[in-house]
């Protein structure tokens, strides 16, 4: 692994105060330069001070040119990072030690320092205190030139973020994409910490064979890396979880002041590693195979509601591993006390990071869902304001959401579990409910209907039961159909008996014997019964069952309103042998239509209503 010298160069930000008497051409050169970020950068250009950056870029370019000249190593590795400190802007310049020994480093740096003053500052030395200095092994006199290895970059420089981080340059292949990309920086830092933790784990010394918890050792770095690795494996993100997992380990790290200071930093680093390198199945799937799953509470709830536990477990496992693509959500639907919240709560608390949807805050409903392993939507409703973002999240798409008092953040594909006793596919907009998004929402969900109420002493699902259930699912995977409603039953057909097991059927007793065909009554043809037929049976010559509409049309009061006659041949055709009788009525009063037309109709229902005779009413008192 190559070694690097570190030179810290302070950059003037106040030209009048730090460079008294500097020319106007220098000021114009600094002020006119405009910087733009490369396309692959996710940094905020508004947080970058462009005037000091112009000077810093010129300083690092001329410094590296002179370094290659004195070291006679044109391909020497370097990493330069420009930062905004509390008092001054400064650069960390890491240059490979190849070609320059420590005893002559001061001589060469003095020459480079003078070159920078003459070429860049026009002969005016900055008034910044100790503006050009090499890092020493210790402060004060007597310290040697410090040589750092490549781990210094991911340990100290890469974790820097804006606004402290301003810019970076390098010719090292592994860090080219991370110079101006904060996401790549986080990934490399997490990868480095994981690698170091695994290395320390492999080289454990004096480890207690009866416990996998870390203990205090003589080497601080080894102890710290061992601690971080153990926290990551156990999914511990807080001191409370640490105490619950291993109380002796937590107390041992609080015994000394130097180890006590590592607790918060170790938990923070472990959280970063877990969020970047781990997924939900790493903590949901148990390590040991399960022999008897029948006592598992999740198994009992699914079986109680008519689901095949093996098929349902495969749905849960595929959901956690994100193997169903767009169908990224499990919806547990049912009334209260059916176990839906019991299951969802246990799954959410088994992973180190889970987020809850705050559907009551329509402005920032997904504020808590960034960088999580599982998203839990508890007893909510789908509103018109959040439905589009919700469809993207439920479908496992990358989407940016607004956060309170922060800039928008991206939610990566994350498994979602929904619990509700209302229709989550109906979109509520004010006082109206629409179903235009019902099919897209159903295409993103697996729906479990839990309708059986649990006993009051059923108990809570534990983390270990969740891990055992997912482990059992992994060992008994079956093919899952991509459908909204998870099929129930799952009962397997019994195999057909062998020939030896088939016995002769018993003789039927005469008292319960079925009548023969000859004894059965002849079927009735209702087509002969109806003179008028409805539009459904108008062309039928054989009707095995009665029709309510045909019955109504063959009552005495049934008259064709269009032609004023019964048994209308045009509307309800019958055989030619049956005559059509026309019913003619005499009206004293006419309805307003026939009154205007001046024509007396043969039959009219409106005229019947005008000429009602109470003597003919069967309900007359």
UniProtKB/Swiss-Prot annotation:
Residues given in the record as a divalent metal cation binding sites: 83, 90, 92
Entry annotated with the keyword Nuclease: yes
Subcellular location: Host nucleus
GO aspect biological process, one term: viral DNA genome replication
Biased composition (Polar residues): 196-211
Cofactor: a divalent metal cation
Binding site for ATP: 334-341
One cellular component (GO) term of this entry: host cell nucleus
Chain ranges of the PV NS1-Nuc domain: 1-199
Active site positions: 156 (for nuclease activity)
GO molecular function, one term: metal ion binding
Pfam family, one: Rep_N
Domain of life, per lineage: Viruses
UniProt subunit comment: Hexamer when associated with the viral DNA ori sequence. Interacts with host PRKX. Interacts with host TOPORS. Interacts with host TBP and SUB1/PC4; these interactions play important roles in transcriptional regulation.
Role, per record: Plays an essential role in the initiation of viral DNA synthesis. Binds specifically to an inverted terminal repeat element (ITR) on the 3' and 5' ends of the viral DNA, where it cleaves a site specifically to generate a priming site for initiation of the synthesis of a complementary strand. Also plays a role as transcriptional regulator, DNA helicase and as key factors in site-specific integration of the viral genome. Regulates host PKA activity by interacting with host PRKX as a mechanism of interfering with helper virus propagation and promoting its own replication.
Protein name: Protein Rep78
Encoding gene per record: Rep78
